[in-house]
């Protein structure tokens, strides 16, 4: 191999290593990174202050089953209904290690379809009805986040997600087995961001 070819190989190899050694990993590496502690809204801050033990329990429950949490993915959020009524929801956003896609393989619609039919119901089952047994909490915001990698399998690329905002009644009915996941989503607000696009409200179609 000539010196020029050796230099070219070294340069390409170094670039690949550099690309794989940097960039966000999109998940919380500790309980402190997983739990959202600071809120601008006074009521949300009160809910956090009163329910820190629940958030810690959720962190332990998911991570003990090797399910990572998105950064600041455990906490509380507000939700305004179509009738312009503001309510407060428990928030759980997971970033499972088993979900990873290559940018050049498949489409964003295919990724969305697989996650919402295969993975979202699976991880929602980790929740318990008692998690929502909190005064002033009207529902659950549950999100599944996943990376779309461009160069290597561990770093780089961008993030996509699905979040659904579901009233407490329908979460409980799903966990009790009274309705299936698809039926639960009929009474949920579903938000997704794909291909680095803006968050969009969608109505999933199951095939």
Residue ranges and their predicted role:
Residues 61, 66-69, 88, 133-207:
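Polybasic, proline/glycine-rich intrinsically disordered low-complexity segments
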Residues 51, 55-66, 119-131:
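Hydrophobic, Leu/Ile/Phe/Ala-enriched alpha-helical segments that form helix-helix packing faces
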Residues 26-34:
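N-terminal targeting/trafficking signals and adjacent low-complexity tails
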Residues 98-151:
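Mature extracytoplasmic domains of secretory-pathway proteins
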Residues 37, 41, 45-48, 52, ...:
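Short edge beta-strands and adjacent turn/loop segments
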Residues 1-9:
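Bacterial N-terminal signal peptides that target proteins for export
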Residues 18-19:
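C-terminal motif of bacterial Sec signal peptides marking the signal peptidase cleavage site
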